[in-house]
Amino acid sequence: MSSSGAMPAVSSASSSAAVGILSATTAKTKTKKKHFVQQKVKVFRASDPLISVFMWGVNHSVNELIQVPVPVMLLPDDFKANSKIKVTNHLFNRENLPSHFKFKDYCPQVFRNLRERFGIDDQDFQASLTRSSPYCESEGHDGRFLLSYDKTLVIKEISSEDVADMHNILSHYHQHIVKCHGNTLLPQFLGMYRLSVDNEDSYIMVMRNMFSHRLTVHRKYDLKGSLVSREASDKEKIKELPTLKDMDFLNKSQKVYVDEEQKKNFMEKLKRDVDFLVQLKLMDYSLLLGIHEVFRAEQEEEEDLEEDHTENESSPHMNVGSYGTSPEGIAGYLNSHKPLGPGEFEPIIDVYAIKSSDNAPQKEVYFMGLIDILTHYDAKKKAAHAAKTVKHGAGAEISTVHPDQYGKRFLEFVTNIFA
C-alpha cells in the first residue's frame, strides 16, 4: 500500500462526507461544551499548517487502509513497513494546506491491529482526528501535546529517536498486548506518523487519552517512586492544573481510595506491565494519576449552566452542533446509551478510570496509567548515574538506577499510594 509520487490533494480530501471543522483553540480545564460548525467538505482547517497536514494524512491513510484486506496474521516485515505519500497541492484548499508536503504512516498494519485490539474502530479513529481540528493542550521543551477535538485521543510530538525506540520495542509491545488481551496500563499506541512541511520533519504519536473526555481532572500527579528532585517547581504550581510529583503527593498526604477488588486488579495489571518494561530494560516511566472530584464537578457544571444561560440571552446562537452530538468518533458510542450521571463513565472509553470506594472521604474518580515508557537503560543513563552518585553519595535515593531496581522501587511506591 505504499503510494508516492505527486498527487493533487483534492482527489483524497474533497470526496469525503460533510465534516465539522474548528480552528485550533487552547482548551480551558473546565468542561465547557465545544462547538464546531458542520461544513460540506473536509477542508482540514487548523490555525497551523502542520495540523492541517496531519488531519489530511490521517484521513488519507485510513481511507487507503480500508481498501486493503486485514491480514490473517502480522509478518515481521509489517513491523518495518511504512506507507508514504508526497503531495503537490496546487488548487484544493490552499489557504489551509501547504503547496508541498509529505506524509508517512509507520507500520500501518501493526497500528491498525493494535487499534482493533484496543476496541477502536478505524472510522471512529479517523473521525475523532479529522472531524474537527485538534487543539493544543501544552507546549513543552519536548514538543507539543494536543488533544483530539472530542478529547478521546492524545496527539504528541515526538523525536526521531523516539521513533527509533518505538520501532525497537513495537513487536514486543504488540505481543504483550495480544497476551493481555489489550487489558493494560501501558500507553495505547494507535498510530505513528512523520509530517514533512517546508523541508522540516515532525514526528507524531497518537495514543488514547488516559484522562476522561468528559470528566474534568482536578488534580494531576506524575509518580516515579523516587524522592530526589521530585517536587513540582513554584512555576509549575501556579498553573491551573499543575503536574505534581512524588514529594507533593507525600506532603499533601494524598491517598487513592478504591475497594480491595479494584486495587487487586490494578496491581496485577501494573505488575505484569512493569515486568514487561523491566525485561526490555526500559525505565524512567511514571504513573500518571488524575483525580476527578465529583462534588466539585457538579458545582462547576452549575456555574457553567448559569454562564451559558446569561450568554444565550445576550447573543443569538449560531446553528452548530456541540461536540459529542455526532454519531461518529470514539466517544460517539455514548450517544446511543443513557446519559451518564455525575462521576459516571463508560469503561470501554475511559479505560484507565476507577471509581473511589464507598467509604472514601469524598466521591472521586481516578485515572491511572503508565507514561513515558521509551527510555532505555543505555550509556546515557549510566553516565547520569555516575554523575548523580558523585553529587548525592552512593546511598542516596536517585532516579537513575538499573531497570530491575527501578521497577521494584516503582511498584513499592505505587502499592503505598492506596489508603
From Swiss-Prot:
Q: Where is the composition biased (Acidic residues)?
A: 299-310
Q: Which PROSITE patterns match?
A: PIPK (PS51455)
**Is-annotated flag, keyword Lyase?**
no
Which Gene Ontology cellular component terms are annotated? endoplasmic reticulum
The record's catalysed reaction(s) read: a 1,2-diacyl-sn-glycero-3-phospho-(1D-myo-inositol-5-phosphate) + ATP = a 1,2-diacyl-sn-glycero-3-phospho-(1D-myo-inositol-4,5-bisphosphate) + ADP + H(+); 1,2-dihexadecanoyl-sn-glycero-3-phospho-(1D-myo-inositol-5-phosphate) + ATP = 1,2-dihexadecanoyl-sn-glycero-3-phospho-(1D-myo-inositol-4,5-bisphosphate) + ADP + H(+); 1,2-dihexadecanoyl-sn-glycero-3-phospho-(1D-myo-inositol-5-phosphate) + GTP = 1,2-dihexadecanoyl-sn-glycero-3-phospho-(1D-myo-inositol-4,5-bisphosphate) + GDP + H(+)
Give the GO molecular function terms: 1-phosphatidylinositol-4-phosphate 5-kinase activity; 1-phosphatidylinositol-5-phosphate 4-kinase activity; ATP binding
Post-translational modification as stated in the protein's UniProt record: Phosphorylated, phosphorylation is induced by EGF.
Provide the E.C. number(s) assigned to this enzyme. 2.7.1.149
Biological function: Phosphatidylinositol 5-phosphate 4-kinase with low enzymatic activity. May be a GTP sensor, has higher GTP-dependent kinase activity than ATP-dependent kinase activity.
- Please identify the protein, giving its name as recorded: Phosphatidylinositol 5-phosphate 4-kinase type-2 gamma
- The record lists the organism as Xenopus tropicalis (Western clawed frog)
Q: What is the lineage of its organism?
A: Eukaryota, Metazoa, Chordata, Craniata, Vertebrata
